């Protein structure tokens, strides 16, 4: 923390511009890499027209979106409608100011860390900024004056509420063993051993939570095409839609960088490169850090190509019935072992590693179970009974789960409601 607050003004501006350029280039390359990777996994060429082998496709798409006509639907709240994309973009870029790219280096004779700034509670600040970004989504859905965007915004709010709890609990174990919430101090604490080896359950929980936090497949319920057309940005076009898309990919980059910072040693070189004396000095750490970030981005692309979208009840059950309880148990175990370490227990490292592997194995095996809430029909079939007569037997093709009613039609009654009404 003593390295911050001493930079000259032009160096601070240069760092801010460098972060902005890094994020914009990462977004352009990530979109192209995702489309190319999806094409290869689906046995098709992918983008191959604009530029050499399609390398300029993302840039062409960005220019096209910026030059498109901006269509503004009627019946909207104009101020909120136009401000919502900005609210999503600004926190996404701001969070990267606390991510360390490398150690202290010399820039034109000035010694400065490769990080814009740091705080004693930097990780919590990043967590708060990610929560602020969802305001843009929910406000955009509400201001659009349409049903599908509103449902997408509400879903996004529920996702953030559900998965930020698990994400915050995954940070707790890191704070316990690093002794700090500062990103630079957490990286310094991983000088010898990365926390992915000591705190494996926290890493697994964070991986799942960060996918849910960024609304990416298989957790992209706020913009599910088959249910909500395009979700919260259905009524957006041109540059406003591009800003929502930019915020999504910048958020992906930010949570990937935070994962590398908390669990993979940040800018520290991996083994066996760390055996080289100069691997963690100078500008080389920027390369190691960027490679780790791209590893997590590749995971995002892979998940989108291979996993189907979860149902909404499965997604909520995964967060509240598995991730949060396991996080609480793991934090308790980690705190007990940390207390033993403070009291002079010599074998705290093997105890922590064994506990970490056991809890992570239980968590991964539990992920194979379908997280769904059985309805009355499923429960009746499991008991070997026929379900009670419902609206379907009366000729109405109404679903047996809560849905918005069609115009001029009443809400579908749950199974067995007709019997209860008859008894009453």
Curated annotation (Swiss-Prot):
GO terms for biological process: aerobic respiration. It catalyses: a quinone + NADH + 5 H(+)(in) = a quinol + NAD(+) + 4 H(+)(out). One of its GO terms (molecular function) is NADH dehydrogenase activity. InterPro entries: NADH_UbQ_OxRdtase_su1/FPO (IPR001694), NADH_UbQ_OxRdtase_su1_CS (IPR018086). It is an enzyme of class 7 (translocase). GO terms for cellular component: plasma membrane. It holds the Pfam family NADHdh. It is a multi-pass membrane protein. It is found in: Cell membrane. Keywords: Cell membrane, Membrane, NAD, Quinone, Translocase, Transmembrane, Transmembrane helix. The chain crosses the membrane at residues 11-31, 79-99, 119-139, 160-180, 193-213, 255-275, 283-303, 317-337, 347-367. Its main location: membrane. Residues 376-424 are annotated as: Disordered. It comes from the Bacteria. Its EC number is 7.1.1.-. NDH-1 is composed of 14 different subunits. Subunits NuoA, H, J, K, L, M, N constitute the membrane sector of the complex. NDH-1 shuttles electrons from NADH, via FMN and iron-sulfur (Fe-S) centers, to quinones in the respiratory chain. The immediate electron acceptor for the enzyme in this species is believed to be menaquinone. Couples the redox reaction to proton translocation (for every two electrons transferred, four hydrogen ions are translocated across the cytoplasmic membrane), and thus conserves the redox energy in a proton gradient. This subunit may bind ubiquinone. HAMAP family: NDH1_NuoH. Belongs to the complex I subunit 1 family. NCBIfam families: PRK06076.1-2 (NF004741), PRK06076.1-4 (NF004743). This is NADH-quinone oxidoreductase subunit H. The lineage of its organism: Bacteria, Bacillati, Actinomycetota, Actinomycetes, Mycobacteriales. The gene is nuoH.
